[in-house]
Each structure stands twice: as C-alpha cells, then as structure tokens.
C-alpha cells in the first residue's frame, strides 16, 4: 500500500497537524518506507512459531516483599498546616 500526497494531507488534517508544503514529499516518502517495512514483516511465515513475551527464557530473582520502613504518617501530619480525616488540606488554586 502506497500513500499519495492527498492521503498524507488527509491524515495530517485528521490529526490536526499543520504540514509545510515543502515537507510533504519527504513525509510521504518516509511514511511509504514505514508501510513497506510493515508489508515485509506481514509477509514473514510465522506458522509453528510460538509467541514470545520476551526473547530470553530468563526469570528475575525477586526479593521478599518485606516492609523496611515504618509509617511516619502521624509525625508528618502533626506538622502540616491543615489536616482532616487523615488527608492534607491545601488551598484551592483553580477557580
């Protein structure tokens, strides 16, 4: 599938992108190159190939999920200018 100038102009209009007239040939060529690459990838025979989440069969060593810090919420809220029901109150900044 090859894009023409009118296709690129329509895509730019739909995306609300303003393009310079001088850039249209370059952009059209670049988009056609990308679509050509997609066509090449679509042509590859992938029958019998299992989908992969990752190309390597490696697993990560994970640490134990252990709490390492204590809860300082009360100490932080005791010095806050305004707190209500455990939430910090801040001044309204948008009308």
Curated annotation (Swiss-Prot):
EC numbers, comma separated: 6.3.5.-
Keywords: ATP-binding, Ligase, Nucleotide-binding, Protein biosynthesis
Similarity comment: Belongs to the GatC family.
InterPro entries noted in UniProt: Asp/Glu-ADT_sf_sub_c, GatC
GO MF annotations, alphabetized: asparaginyl-tRNA synthase (glutamine-hydrolyzing) activity; ATP binding; glutaminyl-tRNA synthase (glutamine-hydrolyzing) activity
One Pfam family matching this protein: GatC
Name of this protein: Aspartyl/glutamyl-tRNA(Asn/Gln) amidotransferase subunit C
Assembly mode: Heterotrimer of A, B and C subunits.
Catalytic activity: L-glutamyl-tRNA(Gln) + L-glutamine + ATP + H2O = L-glutaminyl-tRNA(Gln) + L-glutamate + ADP + phosphate + H(+); L-aspartyl-tRNA(Asn) + L-glutamine + ATP + H2O = L-asparaginyl-tRNA(Asn) + L-glutamate + ADP + phosphate + 2 H(+)
Role summary: Allows the formation of correctly charged Asn-tRNA(Asn) or Gln-tRNA(Gln) through the transamidation of misacylated Asp-tRNA(Asn) or Glu-tRNA(Gln) in organisms which lack either or both of asparaginyl-tRNA or glutaminyl-tRNA synthetases. The reaction takes place in the presence of glutamine and ATP through an activated phospho-Asp-tRNA(Asn) or phospho-Glu-tRNA(Gln).
GO terms, biological process: glutaminyl-tRNAGln biosynthesis via transamidation; regulation of translational fidelity; translation
Encoding gene per record: gatC
PANTHER family linked to this entry: GLUTAMYL-TRNA(GLN) AMIDOTRANSFERASE SUBUNIT C, MITOCHONDRIAL (PTHR15004:SF0)
NCBIfam families found in the cross-reference section: gatC
HAMAP family from the UniProt entry: GatC
Organism: Pseudomonas fluorescens (strain ATCC BAA-477 / NRRL B-23932 / Pf-5)
UniProt xrefs under Gene3D superfamilies: Glu-tRNAGln amidotransferase C subunit, N-terminal domain
């Amino acid at each position: 599938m090859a894009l023409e100038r009118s296709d690129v102009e329509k895509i730019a209009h739909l995306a609300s992108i303003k393009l310079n007239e001088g850039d249209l040939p370059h952009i059209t060529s670049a988009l056609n190159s990308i679509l050509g690459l997609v066509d090449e990838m679509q042509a590859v025979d992938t029958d019998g190939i299992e989908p992969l989440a990752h190309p390597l069969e490696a697993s990560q060593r994970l640490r134990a999920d252990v709490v390492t810090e204590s809860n300082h919420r009360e100490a932080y809220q005791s010095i806050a200018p305004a707190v209500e029901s455990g939430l910090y109150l801040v001044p309204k900044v948008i009308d």
